Amino acid sequence: MDVGELLSYQPNRGTKRPRDDEEEELKTRRKQTGPRERGRYREDEATAAEDADDDKKRLLQIIDRDGEEEEEEEEPLDESSVKKMILTFEKRSYKNQELRIKFPDNPEKFMESELDLNDIIQEMHVVATMPDLYHLLVELSAVQSLLGLLGHDNTDVSIAVVDLLQELTDIDTLHESEEGAEVLIDALVDGQVVALLVQNLERLDESVREEADGVHNTLAIVENMAEFRPEMCTEAAQQGLLQWLLKRLKAKMPFDANKLYCSEVLAILLQDNDENRELLGELDGIDVLLQQLSVFKRHNPSTAEEQEMMENLFDALCSCLMLSSNRERFLKGEGLQLMNLMLREKKISRSSALKVLDHAMIGPEGADNCHKFVDILGLRTIFPLFMKSPRKIKKVGTTEKEHEEHVCSILASLLRNLRGQQRTRLLNKFTENDSEKVDRLMELHFKYLGAMQVADKKIEGEKHDIVRRGEIIDNDMEDEFYLRRLDAGLFILQHICYIMAEICNANVPQIRQRVHQILNMRGSSIKIVRHIIKEYAENIGDGRSPEFRETEQKRILGLLENF
């Protein structure tokens, strides 16, 4: 085996499936050697067997000899061999660059150097097995050279670099050597890797299989880096990635794995990041998300992958609505009308649309959306969902508890924010049909009160055991217990009790009498409701200004005076 064969040898890394055309070729070969074909040569079978044995022996001798030569030639992967590999890479990169400058209009002159360059890039994949040696890639400026090649005139070379970077930044590999990973990620960030990747993305043609793979691997690099260093998401978005993702999502192309991946990376960039949420709003991203989701108002996703993309887009929208400026964009983009239509159509998108409405209306920033929701007859949509949880929600991955949480949160937001005629229309709903909605509210109250009492009993037992062991229950433990109680049902119970307090303060005697009547019938007490609301007020407004928190607490506690 000569040196050229060794250099061009590429081990099967097992990361990609065989392509469709390769599979077809394999099938064709199998067909060509089927029983009928073999039958034609039965007369020569004995002779062929003898020849085959001789050929087999000769082949085994050649393999053994080549194997011995390879063992002698092959160096173990250590610092020295990596340095040698990087040096070869730099030489080939420089030679290719030199020939391209010298013979810009004569590809034959530089094509061989390009193939050599591609070969050494493939060989460098072996470095991904030794993250402890990543520092050599930085110290010997290989990272800088690789980033430079992302702009290579030949997209085959830039795609090869993307493939290599994807493997070097594999999240499992990065965690094998934190020190090596930090050095590599620092160098990539300093070299503005995302900006260069986006420039390369702009010229890739996804109708070409290799270039579509290049897009997928580019997104994988971003995901890997974001998982290892979440703070780089802001810089990545500002370097053109967010704009490219939005453009790719709205491109008129059939749904594929790359569109799914784009939705996933978009959701990652927006997670807990107000700067990126604001940037998305400025780029008209709210409209893009609403346009993409509008497809699912009357049609369910056709595959599990398409459903996953839909959920990613809903998550991205919910994340954006955490920012008040995006609530206004959502309102102007007729997001409320779209979500209301989805609730009525009863498709898979309904559960996620409910979650979006919850995010759009919550807090004082949701006041405009609350008023508009009543104007578009949203009360006719939300109250049937309040009266009865849909049976099919389990099929779309939403629990009955999650559904009831969102509905009660929306009603609480409406009661908090509505004024004038819209508020009157809302309160009238609680008096319709012999106050059936008050009855349903009380039914939910006792349902989640029971769940809370079970959870509280368990937590009290745990606290007793801790004290008995002589340990102290610190603030962190108390916070953990409170979060457990919220998850067990306290969160929705607080909203239910808040709704009770609001409607009992509405100067509608019929509602107040019905609430007290049901509490007495069930042997419950107004004191329990008061206690839950006080606890709710004490914990409200986390992450907001002290002024808002104080004002909101006074307002909520004021409701108890006339309860």
UniProtKB/Swiss-Prot annotation:
UniProt modified residues of type N-acetylmethionine: 1
HEAT repeat feature ranges: 79-129, 134-176
Short name of any one Pfam family annotated for the protein: CTNNBL
Keywords recorded for this protein, A-Z: Acetylation, Adaptive immunity, Coiled coil, Immunity, mRNA processing, mRNA splicing, Nucleus, Phosphoprotein, Repeat, Spliceosome
Subunit structure as annotated in this protein's UniProt entry: Component of the PRP19-CDC5L splicing complex composed of a core complex comprising a homotetramer of PRPF19, CDC5L, PLRG1 and BCAS2, and at least three less stably associated proteins CTNNBL1, CWC15 and HSPA8. Interacts directly with CWC15 and CDC5L in the complex. Interacts with AICDA; the interaction is important for the antibody diversification activity of AICDA. Interacts with PRPF31 (via its NLS). Interacts (via its N-terminal NLS) with KPNA1 and KPNA2.
Modified positions (N6-acetyllysine) in chain numbering: 91
Subcellular location: Nucleus
Species this protein is from: Rattus norvegicus (Rat)
Superkingdom of the organism of origin: Eukaryota
UniProt note: domains: The surface residues of the concave side of the superhelical ARM repeat region contribute to, but are not essential for NLS binding.
Region (Disordered): 1-81
Gene name of the record: Ctnnbl1
GO molecular function annotations of the record: enzyme binding
Name this polypeptide is given: Beta-catenin-like protein 1
Motif (Nuclear export signal (NES)): 130-140
Motif stretch (Nuclear localization signal): 16-33
Record field: compositional bias (Basic and acidic residues): 34-45
SMART domains referenced in this protein's UniProt entry, alphabetically: DUF1716
GO BP terms: adaptive immune response; mRNA processing; positive regulation of apoptotic process; RNA splicing; somatic diversification of immunoglobulins
Gene Ontology CC terms: nucleus; Prp19 complex; spliceosomal complex
Biased composition (Acidic residues): 66-78
Keyword Secreted annotated: no
ARM repeat positions: 178-228, 229-273, 274-323, 325-363, 364-417
Residues recorded with modification Phosphoserine: 389, 545
Protein function: Component of the PRP19-CDC5L complex that forms an integral part of the spliceosome and is required for activating pre-mRNA splicing. Participates in AID/AICDA-mediated somatic hypermutation (SHM) and class-switch recombination (CSR), 2 processes resulting in the production of high-affinity, mutated isotype-switched antibodies.
